[in-house]
Each structure stands twice: as C-alpha cells, then as structure tokens.
Amino acid sequence: GQKKTNACREIFAVELPWLVDVFGGIKALHVFHKKASKLEIAYDDLYQILVEHDSGILGSLTVDVISPEAKRELEVWGEEFCIRWKGSPKTLYRYDKEKKGFEEVSLYERVEHMREYSQFVVENAYYEELVNFIGTVEGKAAPRWSFEQDREILSWIDRIEA
C-alpha cells in the first residue's frame, strides 16, 4: 500500500468527521504510533490517540489495521450521561438515569449490510451521503459537510501521522 492512502489514514478520514460533528472540534491530540506488524509497508499500522475536543470532552481512538479481529467500539462518559457502542447499528445503548440501566438507541429503521464486510460496515451512511449530494446539486439541500471541514480533518490526520 501507499503511505498517502494507507489503511490507517482511511480509517481516520471515516472516524474523525463524525467524532468532530458529535463532540466538537479538535483542541489537542496526543498520539502514540508504530509499525507493529512484520508487513513490508512504509507506514505505521497501529495508533493510539487521546483527543481533547473544543467542548472539553476527552476521548481515545485506537486504529489497528493488523489485528485479526476488526473492532469498532465507543464508550462516552459524562456527569449526566453514558453511551456504549460496539460498532454495529444494533449495539448503541445510553444510560437511563431514571431506570438505572441501559436502553437501546435505534439508529436505522432498516440496515443495509453486505455479507463480505464486517458487521459494523453498513451501507446506510453511504446512501444518506449520496442523497445529500444529489439534493445539494439540485439545490434542494445544504451540504452536510464542506471542503473546508475536509481540509481541517486532513490537517489533523497529517499531524497524527507526523
């Protein structure tokens, strides 16, 4: 693979936009990375990142493209909330303080998934992106993401890889 288009970079480009959208812009990053595999590649294949968002939220993101098990998990804690997600549309839970337990959060009425991919890869987001693009071209919708936002995310990815 090419360093400019490596698997880790691709994962950052998928994960960082929605994390920024949900938790706010990135204020600071602390990154640990290395080439952990014996693969003959010219880039690191394991990253552990501590992210501080402008909102004050702290989070960690691990990107590992060599593990035999593909994983995508998220836990978010705050004084007033707790969210757990195991990467697939049916595994998002939020803590209900009144019920003192977790309840499922429904993301989609129907999930589009290709069997060849891991369970956490669903096609719904790609479809929604295309609908928004066509609506924007036709003047019926505003773009959900801008080139300026892309440029900012790419700038953070460059800093992560530095």
For the regions a language model picked out, list residue spans one by one.
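Predominantly a Rossmann-like dinucleotide-binding segment in NAD(P)-dependent oxidoreductases
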Residues: 1-40
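Active-site rim elements
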Residues: 4-6, 117-121, 139-143
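A structural signal for well-ordered alpha-helical scaffolds and beta->alpha junctions
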Residues: 12-19, 85, 123-130, 150
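Short phosphate-engaging motifs
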Residues: 15, 68, 153
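NAD(P)-dinucleotide binding in Rossmann-like oxidoreductases
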Residues: 38-44, 54-128
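C-terminal helix-rich "cap/oligomerization" subdomain common to oxidoreductases
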Residues: 125-162
